[in-house]
């Protein structure tokens, strides 16, 4: 072979590889272009949606041979991820089906697979959007109405299942009901009797289902002026109204109507039989909710009318706005812009709809989807983008909330306080306070003055005391927070008569001279083991005076800032641990922090959090301290419950962390064992990567992890038992006293306390649920007062 020919062969090989790379690159470019075209179809452009669709159909039809799988995947993804463009994509699929029946069948199969997979994986929203898409394909003559009705009937069959949670049955009924606005008209025209039969089955189920959970999820206890409807009841009323209107709605864009002459000639596909996966105890279903209403048409100025509470348009608008928030909540500026670009904004009072939906999210029970600050930041961006109208609507909403605050759920009260204080801090703390001065005549425990007091406390965290004083009218003096300074009793006028003053002064000098923890311990030894708080020392386990002197002196010296306090606690961590070995001693530490910092709520919160992190105090000690007699005057203040919830969350996170670590370790152990046995069997034929000792946890290590998790679960259960037992005790005492004195027990204090009990159940429902049977056996027994017992029963009903 000549050198010339060899050189030519090498060139040919190089050219072949280069051409292959070019083909791959070109294919990728075409795929990216197709994806971009499909994703952007129907969005704003100079041409209409219909002409966009016609052009896209021509492009896709030409590329079906090469990029069929890619197109199938993109379209099915769009169906789930972009439900607001459902009818645009169903029209696109309908036009492709009219031109290529085989592709239409493949897409239906792909969509059915997506639907079944979503149900199996408990992706409930994705399943609902898939069902809606399949239903809308009936309008595009892709799927037969008969086969869709069979699927809907099969889903309603779930409502007759026995021994399954009601939340499972509820979801399947909700999925069917929420699909009917898209396909109801077509089913009414083609299969009216079958549709009526389906609706009758739904009505039978709705009439017999339990709604014990309803009151726990209400934002307001009163139904005036707007009823707080349970979500399925509300949607059912909207569907009945739609049926009365012959299934004619005015909100859903239906581009397929333009192509009716083309689509009606296409052959249709039948859906295969789809059986919902049976219930599994590991399945977590969506919890029920209450439909939030703040405005009606009388609240809106001249312009487009707000659809009625039972019009299907209200449901469709709200669902669309909720989905925009879900899609863009990570970026507040984009979210605000998308909300204000709502496609039907000229047909509705958009600002009112947006504000109502955002507050619906913020006040969603048992917990909002996102952090409170997420909604606050979106509202601020909306005010910036729409300064002429949105601030006025928001002010109107705030006024409505304040006027209805008397019957507001306690959890929602807290969220309202947090939002309003944050909002004020972004707008120079400007508000027309004079309009609310009638609340000054009310009792301090009444929700209105309490709201203003709590708002000012939160504003203090975001500003400084003088600023708060300057922004408020002088008439509000009694609601303005105290100046947040430490009350160091060993420097007061009465200090000379207090035991421990001399040691406290000695300690001040030593700490300022940067003494060691050991030196502090030696100084504290000068305090005798008796003669102070004899009741607490009866068991001889701790010295209350030592704790008093040490805690108050150290934290007073660190009072300049949070950082100074943290540094002081960290440096003398060993002294804290030595003094606070028992729960009683830890409660004594907490009480002394309160005595020093009673005028600074935020300092109290961060210091308790720090003590928990450093394991100086246990979660159970914090819970017991909160319910102690010394804290009676603080019992209805928000910061105390902030401390309780951060304590419970810390315990919950610890349990979840240990649970995750154990699961990972067990998984590694089982994989290592199976890998080892497989490699033994395959040794002659196959070499495997060896399992190192570091990768595989020992069985002893796993056992230790199990023991740690078991101990953590015991501590968590004990914490919940302490909290709920204390609630029952103080509420039962209140009921008994009221009965003895012949007074109405329904006082402001009672409503706050029962609200806090409900808040603990709902805020930590996932963890509390594990112990519901224990709680029922030990605490929430049938002989308990019905008002207290009802809170527990409502909680249990959420997952029933």
UniProtKB/Swiss-Prot annotation:
Residues 31-243 form the MIF4G domain. Residues 1-26, 669-704 are annotated as: Disordered. The keyword NAD does not apply. Pfam families: MIF4G, MIF4G_like, MIF4G_like_2. It comes from the Eukaryota. InterPro entries: ARM-type_fold, CBP80, MIF4G-like_typ-1, MIF4G-like_typ-2, MIF4G-like_typ-3. Residues 692-704 have a biased composition (Basic and acidic residues). GO terms for biological process: 7-methylguanosine mRNA capping; mRNA export from nucleus; negative regulation of viral genome replication; nuclear-transcribed mRNA catabolic process, nonsense-mediated decay; primary miRNA processing; regulatory ncRNA-mediated post-transcriptional gene silencing; RNA splicing; siRNA processing. The modification Phosphothreonine is found at residue 9. Keywords: mRNA capping, mRNA processing, mRNA splicing, Nucleus, Phosphoprotein, RNA-mediated gene silencing. GO terms for cellular component: nuclear cap binding complex; nucleus; postsynaptic cytosol; presynaptic cytosol. Its main location: nucleus. One of its GO terms (molecular function) is mRNA binding. The keyword Nucleus applies. Component of the cap-binding complex (CBC), which binds cotranscriptionally to the 5'-cap of pre-mRNAs and is involved in various processes such as pre-mRNA splicing and RNA-mediated gene silencing (RNAi). The CBC complex is involved in miRNA-mediated RNA interference via its interaction with Ars2 and is required for primary microRNAs (miRNAs) processing. Also involved in innate immunity via the short interfering RNAs (siRNAs) processing machinery by restricting the viral RNA production. Component of the nuclear cap-binding complex (CBC), a heterodimer composed of Cbp80 and Cbp20 that interacts with m7GpppG-capped RNA. Belongs to the NCBP1 family. This is Nuclear cap-binding protein subunit 1. It comes from Drosophila persimilis.
């Amino acid at each position: 072979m000549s050198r010339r020919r060899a050189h030519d062969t090498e060139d040919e090989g190089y050219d072949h590889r280069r051409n292959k790379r070019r083909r791959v690159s070109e294919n990728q470019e075409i795929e990216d272009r197709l994806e971009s075209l499909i994703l952007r179809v129907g969005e704003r452009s100079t041409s209409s949606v219909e002409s966009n669709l016609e052009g896209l159909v021509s492009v896709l039809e030409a590329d079906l041979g090469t990029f069929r799988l890619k197109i199938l995947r993109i379209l099915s993804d769009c169906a789930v991820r972009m439900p607001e463009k459902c009818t645009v994509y169903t029209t696109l699929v309908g036009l492709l089906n009219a031109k290529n029946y085989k592709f239409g069948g493949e897409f239906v199969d792909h969509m059915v697979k997506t639907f079944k997979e979503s149900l199996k994986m408990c992706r409930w929203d994705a399943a609902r959007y898939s069902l809606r898409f399949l239903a809308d394909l009936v309008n595009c003559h892709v799927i037969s109405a008969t086969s869709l009705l069979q699927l809907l009937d099969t889903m309603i069959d779930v409502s007759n299942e026995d021994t399954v949670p009601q939340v499972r049955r509820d979801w399947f009924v909700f999925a069917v009901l929420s699909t009917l606005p898209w396909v109801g008209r077509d089913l009414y025209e083609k299969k009216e009797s079958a549709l009526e039969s389906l609706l009758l089955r739904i009505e039978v189920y709705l009439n017999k289902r339990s709604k014990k959970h309803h009151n726990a999820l209400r934002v307001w206890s009163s139904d005036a002026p707007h009823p707080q409807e349970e979500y399925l009841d509300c949607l059912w009323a909207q569907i009945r109204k739609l049926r009365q209107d012959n299934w004619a709605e005015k909100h859903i864009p239906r581009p397929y109507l333009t192509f009716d002459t083309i689509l009606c000639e296409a052959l249709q596909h039948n859906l295969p039989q789809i059986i919902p996966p049976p219930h599994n105890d590991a399945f977590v279903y969506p919890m029920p909710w209450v439909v939030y209403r703040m405005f009606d048409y009388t609240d809106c100025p001249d312009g487009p009318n707000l659809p009625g509470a039972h019009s299907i348009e209200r449901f469709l608008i709200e669902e669309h706005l909720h989905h925009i928030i879900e899609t863009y909540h990570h970026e507040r500026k984009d979210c605000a812009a998308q909300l204000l670009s709502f496609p039907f904004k000229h047909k509705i009072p958009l600002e009112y709809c947006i504000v109502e939906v955002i507050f619906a999210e913020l006040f969603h029970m048992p917990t909002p989807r996102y952090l409170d600050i997420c909604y606050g930041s979106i509202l601020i961006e909306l005010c910036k983008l729409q300064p002429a109208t949105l601030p006025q609507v928001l002010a109107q909403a705030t006024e409505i909330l304040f006027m209805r605050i008397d019957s507001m759920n306690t959890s929602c009260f807290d969220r309202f306080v947090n939002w309003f204080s944050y909002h004020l801090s972004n707008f120079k703390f400007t508000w027309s306070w004079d309009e609310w001065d009638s609340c000054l005549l009310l009792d301090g425990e009444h929700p209105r003055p309490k709201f203003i007091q709590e708002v000012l406390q939160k504003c203090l965290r975001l500003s400084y005391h003088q600023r708060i004083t300057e922004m408020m009218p002088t008439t509000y003096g009694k609601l303005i927070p105290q100046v947040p300074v430490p009350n160091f009793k060993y420097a007061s006028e009465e200090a000379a008569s207090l035991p421990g003053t001399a040691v406290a002064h000695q300690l001040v000098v030593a700490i300022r001279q940067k003494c060691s923890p050991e030196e502090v311990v030696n100084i504290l030894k000068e305090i005798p083991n008796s003669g102070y708080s004899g009741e607490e020392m009866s068991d001889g386990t701790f010295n209350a005076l030592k704790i008093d002197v040490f805690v108050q002196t150290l934290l007073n010296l660190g009072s300049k800032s949070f950082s100074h306090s943290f540094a002081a606690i960290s440096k003398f961590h060993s002294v804290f641990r030595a003094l606070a070995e028992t729960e009683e001693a830890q409660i004594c530490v907490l009480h002394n922090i309160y005595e020093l910092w009673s005028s600074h709520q935020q300092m109290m919160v961060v210091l308790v959090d720090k003590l928990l992190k450093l394991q100086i105090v246990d979660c159970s000690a914090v819970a017991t301290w909160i319910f102690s007699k010394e804290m009676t005057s603080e019992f209805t203040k928000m910061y105390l419950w902030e401390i309780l919830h951060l304590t419970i969350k810390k315990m919950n996170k610890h349990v979840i962390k240990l649970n995750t670590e154990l699961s990972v370790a067990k998984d590694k152990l089982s994989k290592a064992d199976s890998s080892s046995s497989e490699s033994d069997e395959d040794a002659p034929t196959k070499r495997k990567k060896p399992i190192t000792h570091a990768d595989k946890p020992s069985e002893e290590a796993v056992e230790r992890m199990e023991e740690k998790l078991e101990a953590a679960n015991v501590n968590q259960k004990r914490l919940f038992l302490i909290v709920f037992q204390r609630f029952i005790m103080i509420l039962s005492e209140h009921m008994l006293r009221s009965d003895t004195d012949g007074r109405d027990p329904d006082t402001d204090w009672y409503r706050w306390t029962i609200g806090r009990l409900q808040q603990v159940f709902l805020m930590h429902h996932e963890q509390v649920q594990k112990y519901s049977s224990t709680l029922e056996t030990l605490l929430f027994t049938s002989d308990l007062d019905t008002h207290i017992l009802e809170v527990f029963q409502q909680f249990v009903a959420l997952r029933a």
